[in-house]
UniProtKB/Swiss-Prot annotation:
This is Glycosyltransferase GlyF. InterPro entries: Glyco_trans_8, Glycosyltrans_8_dom-fam, Nucleotide-diphossugar_trans. Encoded in RD10, a pathogenicity island with an atypical GC content that is associated with invasive pneumococcal disease. Pathogenicity islands account for greater than half the genomic diversity observed between isolates. The main function of this island seems to be correct synthesis and export of pneumococcal serine-rich repeat protein PsrP. It holds the Pfam family Glyco_transf_8. Keywords: Glycosyltransferase, Manganese, Metal-binding, Nucleotide-binding, Transferase. UDP binds at residues 8-13, 101-102, 221-227.
């Protein structure tokens, strides 16, 4: 079965757009892509189309006049091209079409989604508590499964265009508001795996959230301004977006790639972490330089100073600013050592949590957060950082 997928983007969004396409084609074949756009160069389509032939897929540019929507109000971090999705059912030759935003990755097969019974509805989507105008129910428009015949039968595109012309300046979330106002309760709710919105993690830093690394949702949506290509985005599965971004077309053709970011980037299994409120972390850069076989995870529940973020230049360092509180637990699970070497207060009782997790805990004499010597596997003079280096070099892992 061939699958029709529509995306909308502008020239500035080419890299995210191509990443979405790569992710789809790594897991699916026989796909016809339709890209609604006003300014993407034809050369891009011609070259990409040649690459897609090996997976029996096609891509087509569908030009939309941006003047139709350029003056329309949109939601935050969204531009006029978001309104292009209204035309999705007009450009395909199939009975069913899937619309996807370009801040999405697909991690599995889509045949099951395409075969869902829409139960007489014109559209299937995933619930979104932020859907529109402060309503507590509605759907997110980043993924829309549409019955083409019903859209044409009811002239839905014309109705949406008329509604948008009337209300685009008063709605809060642009095209998403318009679609929700039009369909109201007349849509089929689909399982959240088909539009799992990790992008909203940024609004729920302290809320417990599910770890998704080993079993990612079928469609991952980096909704919100916190995109994975931002330098320090906090969303879950940020690294997975970069894996799909990194895929070359031979890997897509043969489906033989390692999609584990940490294996792909050759990250050491020797992992050490610390959580801090302060940029004053004793001998941190020295330790990073002297221990290249260790990967340092530096987390902070706040914005990080340049002093800390600059350490990202080292391949054995990852910085997490405004860290998800749940990620602290995940980092503890994966780490061997916790370093209590930052000045200032302890963050979220993390030293005790590290002990309860069975981690080795090392500290300098002037940075230790507890006077209980039994909490630590080593307390070192801040004047002798090489003693800590030597201790860590002697740690073996299975």
């Amino acid at each position: 079965m061939r699958k029709s997928i529509v995306l909308a983007a502008d020239n500035a969004y080419l890299i995210p757009l191509e990443t979405t396409i790569k992710s789809v084609l790594y897991h699916n074949r026989d796909v016809d892509f339709y890209i609604l756009n006003s300014d993407i160069a034809p050369e891009w389509f011609k070259l990409l189309g040649r690459k897609m032939e090996v997976v029996n897929s096609t891509i087509r540019s569908v030009h939309i006049d941006k003047e139709l929507f350029e003056s329309y109000k949109t939601g935050p971090h969204i531009n006029y091209a978001s309104y292009f999705r209204f035309f999705a059912t007009e450009v395909v030759e199939s009975d069913r079409v899937l619309y996807l935003d370009s801040d999405i990755i697909v991690t599995g097969e889509l045949a099951t989604l395409f075969e869902i019974d829409l139960k007489g509805y014109s559209i299937g989507a995933v619930d979104d508590v932020y859907a529109y105008e402060g309503r507590k129910s509605g759907f997110n428009t980043g993924m829309l499964l549409m019955d083409v015949a019903k859209w044409k039968e009811h002239s839905i595109v014309n109705s949406l265009l008329e509604l948008a012309a009337e209300q685009n300046q008063v709605v809060h979330l642009g095209d998403q508001s318009i679609l929700n106002i039009y369909f109201e309760d007349n849509w089929l709710a689909l399982d959240k795996t088909y539009n799992y919105m990790v992008g909203i993690d940024i609004y729920h830093l302290a809320q417990e959230c599910e770890r998704l690394d080993d079993n990612p949702p079928t469609i991952v949506h980096y909704a919100s301004h916190d995109k994975p290509w931002n330098t320090y985005s906090i969303s879950r599965l940020r690294e997975l977006w970069w894996v799909y971004r990194d895929l070359d077309w031979s890997e897509i053709a043969f489906q033989r790639s390692d999609l584990n970011y940490f294996e792909r980037s050759n990250q050491s299994k020797k992992q050490v972490m610390l959580v801090t409120w302060s940029a004053d972390i004793k001998h941190l850069e020295y330790l990073v330089q002297r221990l290249p076989d260790w990967h340092f995870h530096l987390a902070a529940p706040c914005d990080c100073s340049e002093e800390l973020t600059s350490l990202s230049q080292y391949t054995n360092v990852t910085v997490y600013q405004n860290v998800l509180h749940s990620r602290i637990d995940w980092l503890l699970d994966d780490s061997i050592v916790y370093l209590d070497i930052n000045t200032g207060g302890e963050v979220f009782n993390v030293v005790t949590r590290a002990q309860e997790s069975g981690k080795k805990i090392f500290a300098f004499d002037i940075t230790r957060k507890s006077m209980d010597d039994g909490l630590y596997d080593g307390i070192f003079s801040v004047e002798r950082p090489d003693d800590l280096v030597d201790r860590m070099k002697n740690i073996e892992i299975e």
